[in-house]
């Protein structure tokens, strides 16, 4: 019975914590949602530009290294 309790007790505790978390969460209103969506979009754009410029810098460097061999 002790082996069963060692498996069931963590699952029961996880379920209890999950229910507590869901009860505390709230649905964002339109203003909060648009703010989060805008910041996420800005993050995607910034990361895209960073990736583009890194690629733009390393393509000529790679051609110099590979082209010299």
Curated annotation (Swiss-Prot):
Q: Topologically, how does it sit relative to the membrane?
A: Single-pass membrane protein
Biological-process GO terms, alphabetical: post-translational protein targeting to membrane, translocation
Q: Which residues form the signal peptide?
A: none
> Pfam families this protein is in?
SecE
The transmembrane segments are 33-61
Q: Which GO terms describe its molecular function?
A: protein transmembrane transporter activity
Q: What does this protein do?
A: Necessary for protein translocation in the endoplasmic reticulum.
What is its quaternary makeup? Answer: Heterotrimeric complex composed of SEC61-alpha, SEC61-beta and SEC61-gamma.
Q: Which family does it belong to?
A: Belongs to the SecE/SEC61-gamma family.
What is the name listed in the Swiss-Prot or TrEMBL entry for this protein? Protein transport protein Sec61 subunit gamma
Which species is this record about?
Answer: Oryza sativa subsp. japonica (Rice)
């Amino acid at each position: 019975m002790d082996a069963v309790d060692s498996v069931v007790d963590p699952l029961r505790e996880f379920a209890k914590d999950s229910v507590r978390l869901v009860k505390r969460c709230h649905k964002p209103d339109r203003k909060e949602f648009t703010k989060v969506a805008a910041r996420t979009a800005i993050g995607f754009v910034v990361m895209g530009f960073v990736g583009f410029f890194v690629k733009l810098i390393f393509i000529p460097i790679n051609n110099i290294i590979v082209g010299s061999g």
